[in-house]
């Protein structure tokens, strides 16, 4: 496990070692966080909320 900081509440988040950029992790504060690559290291950011697609 990799120990990262939640960008929302600042608490620790355990992320599996084999996590890939783009994976979504839900934290106990209720935030949905996206794993991303920051200078070769895993980091977390708030995941984008996908809206409804009304296109046909």
Swiss-Prot record:
Keyword Zinc-finger: yes
UniProt keyword Glycoprotein present: no
Positions with a binding annotation for Zn(2+): 6, 9, 27, 29
Biological pathway: Amino-acid biosynthesis; L-lysine biosynthesis via AAA pathway; Amino-acid biosynthesis; L-arginine biosynthesis
Domain of life of the native organism: Archaea
Modified residues (5-glutamyl glutamate): 56
Residue numbers carrying 5-glutamyl N2-lysine: 56
Protein name in UniProt: Alpha-aminoadipate/glutamate carrier protein LysW
Taxonomic source organism: Sulfolobus acidocaldarius (strain ATCC 33909 / DSM 639 / JCM 8929 / NBRC 15157 / NCIMB 11770)
Gene of this entry: lysW
């Amino acid at each position: 496990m990799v120990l990262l900081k939640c960008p929302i509440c600042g608490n620790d988040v355990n992320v599996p070692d084999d996590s890939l950029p783009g994976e979504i992790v839900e934290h106990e504060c209720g935030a949905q966080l996206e794993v991303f690559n920051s200078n070769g290291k895993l980091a977390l950011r708030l995941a984008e909320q996908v809206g409804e697609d009304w296109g046909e």
